[in-house]
Amino acid sequence: MASWSAPSPSLVEYFEGQTSFQCGYCKNKLGSRSYGMWAHSMTVQDYQDLIDRGWRRSGKYVYKPVMDQTCCPQYTIRCHPLQFQPSKSHKKVLKKMLKFLAKGEISKGNCEDEPMDSTVEDAVDGDFALINKLDIKCDLKTLSDLKGSIESEEKEKEKSIKKEGSKEFIHPQSIEEKLGSGEPSHPIKVHIGPKPGKGADLSKPPCRKAREMRKERQRLKRMQQASAAASEAQGQPVCLLPKAKSNQPKSLEDLIFQSLPENASHKLEVRVVRSSPPSPQFRATFQESYQVYKRYQMVVHKDPPDKPTVSQFTRFLCSSPLEAEHPADGPECGYGSFHQQYWLDGKIIAVGVLDILPYCVSSVYLYYDPDYSFLSLGVYSALREIAFTRQLHEKTSQLSYYYMGFYIHSCPKMRYKGQYRPSDLLCPETYVWVPIEQCLPSLDNSKYCRFNQDPEAEDEGRSKELDRLRVFHRRSAMPYGVYKNHQEDPSEEAGVLEYANLVGQKCSERMLLFRH
């Protein structure tokens, strides 16, 4: 079993107060309001806890809408993949893809009739404008001081832990690699032991009962589906596989991995490649992927040719603060940021940008070649991502949710995310999950709602002990209680308290808040 080194602490730079910019949904010039911070590096657990408090990332910029003030409140939404059953419209999209692959048939009619076809992504124009204006004070020279401070701090922890007989301790990685100019650090090499075989010969005995034969066919089908999904998780090409016949209703996997004739018109492969730090597969396909993004932005979002630049693409969809982590009990591909590439006949036609976190797969963005919009790639990719989450759950049981970003009830085009049931919305005041069916009546009456029906309920994860918050100041990591004793400006505490309440007690004690 390969050893695993825990990542260094997250390092963030919080921008005090609220920021107003043009809304990407209703186009209100100053209607969108949010809090924000720049994440120089972030652990996947910290980001998991942040999105469970209403935060979301755009590149390395992490923001949280001011829900009771912003023009279009954005509620975090998650789907339950393990209980998910495709609807009739979902099955229609999957069958349309199969017909196209098998016979080259192109569905007639207006592709815009599909509710998700060109609206699978969140609006980000306002974020880009904001990021360009950010005053980021934590530079590389300052960040290089973090390594020594963390190493010193963790050595003390290591001594203490060893005394207690613990087998694990933290090994800080090079802070220059993680937090530098945006150039990738070297991928972490993890030895993966040989995969278990498929067991004994599965040949059918001479005499077997019908029930036993059905069970055997079902077992073979599950093995085929697991094999295909496992290949996808490791970045290997995945083709549609033959399926075992069954009288049972078709599952999501049945519909996705349905058999194709040997002379099929097209071949679809799905590959998952790590985008940060960039894997060799990601580097090799970067230009082709960017060209798909550029065309998508120009055709679907009507961007001028000079707007979707390589720099913008990299900053928004390739750069990520998330550390690559490979714990023994995690998914084979590890945690972090990835691109799920859809290859049709040897060329990329769509890319889903994903974060794989301890408890979920989080969808960041989708872009595709507009020439293939008739395939309803927004719906198709969401269904593939749900199936991908189910596959990851097989090895990592706590990874059982599919986060679809934000649900925006006040914007009709963005209500499509509520079609993936069962799903929950995050209460913006108490940060508990509430079934979407219970939330919709309230949202029909008011665009901002508290979903938790208990009037006495409070935010249990709120900051309770400000002095335990961690800061990074003058080459040292320290508790806020120590830091404030050396500060002459008492007004600074208001901004620190605002940050602490927004990120919650757990994150405030783990993440390092940079102080200039």
UniProtKB/Swiss-Prot annotation:
Top EC group: transferase
UniProt-listed Enzyme Commission number(s): 2.3.2.8
Function: Involved in the post-translational conjugation of arginine to the N-terminal aspartate or glutamate of a protein. This arginylation is required for degradation of the protein via the ubiquitin pathway. Does not arginylate cysteine residues.
Keyword Ligase assigned: no
Subunit structure comment from the entry: Monomer. Interacts with LIAT1; LIAT1 is not a substrate of ATE1, the interaction takes place in the cytoplasm and seems to increase ATE1 arginyltransferase activity.
GO process annotations (BP): proteasomal protein catabolic process; ubiquitin-dependent protein catabolic process
Alphabetical keyword list: Acyltransferase, Cytoplasm, Nucleus, Transferase, Ubl conjugation pathway
Compartment(s) where it occurs, according to its Swiss-Prot or TrEMBL record: Nucleus; Cytoplasm
Protein family (similarity comment): Belongs to the R-transferase family.
Tissues where this protein is expressed: Widely expressed.
GO annotation, cellular component aspect: cytoplasm; nucleus
The protein's name: Arginyl-tRNA--protein transferase 1
Coiled-coil portions: none
Reaction(s) this enzyme catalyzes, per UniProt: an N-terminal L-alpha-aminoacyl-[protein] + L-arginyl-tRNA(Arg) = an N-terminal L-arginyl-L-aminoacyl-[protein] + tRNA(Arg) + H(+)
Species in which this protein is naturally found: Mus musculus
Record keyword tRNA processing present: no
Gene name in the database record: Ate1
Comp. bias intervals (Basic and acidic residues): 150-180
Molecular-function GO terms, alphabetical: arginyl-tRNA--protein transferase activity
Region named Disordered: 150-206
